[in-house]
């Protein structure tokens, strides 16, 4: 079963948290920072931590994909750490995204 939740962390930003639970165990997860891009007139994903491909990693839109990260082995704790990281450093991630966009780097 997949559980999704949006957590508003500011007037122009939110976290999208997705947990896949099977037989009471957390199988996979993703925590994504989204920001309202005034130039595009819509929310865009800026950064996310997830378990796609079987390994915990971070993706940063326009910057890097599948960056290795040091997270706890426990999947639930790893998801909580990722959520805290994106919440606390949201401004840094958004500014890096904006800089990459200004340089003409492509979104994906």
Region spans (language model):
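Compositionally biased, intrinsically disordered low-complexity regions
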Residues: 12, 26, 55-56, 106
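A short, structured beta-strand/loop element
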Residues: 28-68
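Amphipathic, alpha-helical segments enriched in basic
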Residues: 6-10, 24, 57, 61, ...
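Compositionally biased, intrinsically disordered low-complexity segments
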Residues: 10-12, 49, 97
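Acidic, low-complexity intrinsically disordered segments
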Residues: 61-108
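Negatively charged, low-complexity tracts enriched in Asp/Glu with abundant Ser/Thr
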Residues: 1-39
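Small/flexible residues
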Residues: 1, 15-18, 50, 60-64, ...
